[in-house]
Regions:
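Catalytic nucleophile loop
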Residues: 1-8, 103
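Acidic/charged, solvent-exposed loop-and-adjacent secondary-structure segments enriched in E/D, K/R, S/T
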Residues: 11
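Amide-donor transfer/coupling interface in amidating biosynthetic enzymes
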Residues: 14-128
Length: 128
């Protein structure tokens, strides 16, 4: 999405930025991500509403990551190595675009992120 909108990628995270956070191994890896701005209204598209939580444990299974951001891409969450882990596209450019660098479908059906993303996706579909 970022590349299609004019941004760029790190082709290989361990080679290009190091491995202070393991994003990929021989299986699924868990690590923490934190909200860049806990007050950002876009957060509610991906993350469950809770004013006391600003970090989440997610799974990871990727070796590429966002580098230069395209115009209109807003980073909602990053990992400790500063890689974007959750983004949205400014709603002035697109009515609904959310993306994450983890697998919400593997977090469990009762996970707050999975539920929030699913519910907001269905709401966006129903608006069309």
């Amino acid at each position: 999405i970022n590349v299609a909108a004019g941004g760029s990628l790190y082709a290989d995270i361990p080679t290009q930025i190091g491995n202070t956070v393991t994003h990929r191994n021989n299986g699924e890896v868990n690590h923490s991500i934190y909200l860049v701005d806990p007050q950002n209204t876009y957060n509610s598209l991906i993350f469950p509403k809770n004013d006391t939580i600003s970090s989440f444990n997610v799974n990871s299974w990727h070796h590429q990551g966002l580098n230069d951001l395209a115009k209109g891409v807003i980073v909602l969450a990053r990992s400790n190595d500063m890689l974007p882990e959750a983004i949205v596209l400014d709603s002035n450019l697109h009515p609904f675009m959310i993306a994450v660098q983890f697998h919400p479908e593997r977090l469990g059906e009762n996970n707050g992120i999975s539920i929030t993303m699913r519910d907001n996706f269905f709401k966006a579909i129903n608006k069309r």
